[in-house]
Amino acid sequence: MNDRKLIIAVFVVGLLFGAILGIVYSMYTGRYLQPSSPSYEIHFSPNGGCADTIVFWIGRANQSIHVLMYIFTLQNVAEALISAHDRGIEVKVVFDKSQIAGYSQYALLKSAGIELRNDTNPSGIMHNKVAIIDNRIVITGSFNWTNSAENSNNENLIVIHSVDAASRYESEFQNIWSQSQG
């Protein structure tokens, strides 16, 4: 084998070894690598697994989960947020002021020690449906975190893998958070 072929073979083996190490690292640490260009996932309901997708990404959080949610009644998503909080993840949620009673998960999250605020927009509602995870992942769409959205309504959920998009959503989250009541 000549030197050129040997160099190419060593290079290819090195690439494969690096890819395998990356996969193993991801599997064992639960950490994911940010793609170089934005990518996304699209989900639909009813019965499209939107709630499972939200729970999956909450479970992958390593640092922070910031949520702006109009209506939030899904127990499994609340439990996933509590589990993340118990793992030491910073969890903050802003609810619309009209949605903190009744079937809302507000009381459960508050009793678990999660930082909560009520939007104080005097001229309308806080109609966002957004979660920002680790400043890298944005979950958004028409999907309220409710049983109706999961099982009855025609809804959409988009998971955006983009530091730039997450930064823009995080800026809006911080703006609303700073103007909300705790």
Question: Where in the sequence are the language-model features?
Answer:
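Secretory targeting signatures
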Residues: 1-26
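Primarily the HKD phosphodiesterase
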Residues: 17-18, 56-115
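Ser/Thr/Pro/Gly-rich low-complexity linker/stalk segments immediately outside membranes or between
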Residues: 26-42
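A general structural motif
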Residues: 44-50, 71-74
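N-terminal post-signal-peptidase region of extra-cytosolic proteins
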Residues: 47, 51-53, 115-121
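HKD (HxKxxxxD) catalytic microenvironment of the phospholipase D
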Residues: 65, 117-173
